[in-house]
Amino acid sequence: MPSLKDLRNRIASVKATQKITKAMQMVASAKLRRAQLAAEAARPYAERMDEVLASLASIVGTGPDAPKLLAGNGYDRTHLLVVCTAERGLCGGFNASIARLARDTAEKLIAEGKKVKILCVGKKGYDLLKRQFGEQILELIELRSVRTIGFVNAEAIGRKILNLYKDAEFDVCTLFFAKFRTVLHQIPTAQQLIPLAVKTQEDAPAAPPSLYEYEPSEEQILATLLPRNITIQVLRALLENAASEQGARMSAMDNASRNAGEMIKKQTLKYNRSRQAMITKELIEIISGAEAL
């Protein structure tokens, strides 16, 4: 049975941990609001880009003369998986869920005889995947020093993806991230970037079709928009990830604070019972000694 001193030290240790988890919860809560607003602001632009590209793709088609970023290079042998996770932990299963989706996808592709290459954005994804896919990981892109995710960060990643594609390093590129829904709900998502996954009529929401007139030609517009779309989709993924990370961290730290509170109650109860038993024992010894006299 632990001594009173051990119980006091244990209670003090848990209380110190609870202070840290509460502070982290408050910081995550403050960051969440900004990250959520940024993610929500990026969605309409990315969705409208999808609509315009879908309209252009329906006109141009995916024949041999179509842009490679739209129709692909005709092969499906090498896949690039761009895995976006956080730089830090203590955010529940946020990083693990994205890494798990990427791992399952990689294992399925390898089982089909495909070659897999991985580009990790965020150290935690790299840490989770390096043991199994160390040889397939091309590079780790860290954003630890970035205070606010912006277009410049996404543009650098998008440029790297495009350069790898121009160098024929892969045939298909898929982006992995977590879509933010609520503080308690983040959805691990795999989005194909190259070739462009154009929404079909069944996928599109029921709405009257929009009529567009394009100047210059559709092919010229596609040649400009397709590389930019890579950057836009990467930016959207990074912003969704940032909001999802803070939401997951806030929830995880809230649960940790609650668990610490429960542990403090249990240890305090155990401490009081031990102290009461010790006092009772001492009283019995005093009374027994008095009766002996």
UniProtKB/Swiss-Prot annotation:
One Pfam family this sequence matches: ATP-synt
Gene3D superfamilies reported for this sequence: 3.40.1380.10, ATP synthase, gamma subunit, helix hairpin domain
Cellular localization per UniProt: Cell inner membrane
GO BP of this protein: proton motive force-driven plasma membrane ATP synthesis
Keyword Membrane annotated: yes
Predominant location: membrane
Entry superkingdom: Bacteria
GO MF, one annotated term: proton-transporting ATP synthase activity, rotational mechanism
Gene Ontology CC: one annotated term: plasma membrane
Keywords from the named record: ATP synthesis, Cell inner membrane, Cell membrane, CF(1), Hydrogen ion transport, Ion transport, Membrane, Transport
Function recorded in the entry: Produces ATP from ADP in the presence of a proton gradient across the membrane. The gamma chain is believed to be important in regulating ATPase activity and the flow of protons through the CF(0) complex.
Annotated HAMAP family: ATP_synth_gamma_bact
PANTHER family reported for this sequence: ATP SYNTHASE GAMMA CHAIN (PTHR11693), ATP SYNTHASE SUBUNIT GAMMA, MITOCHONDRIAL (PTHR11693:SF22)
Summary of subunit composition and partner proteins: F-type ATPases have 2 components, CF(1) - the catalytic core - and CF(0) - the membrane proton channel. CF(1) has five subunits: alpha(3), beta(3), gamma(1), delta(1), epsilon(1). CF(0) has three main subunits: a, b and c.
Similarity comment text for this entry: Belongs to the ATPase gamma chain family.
UniProt name for this protein: ATP synthase gamma chain
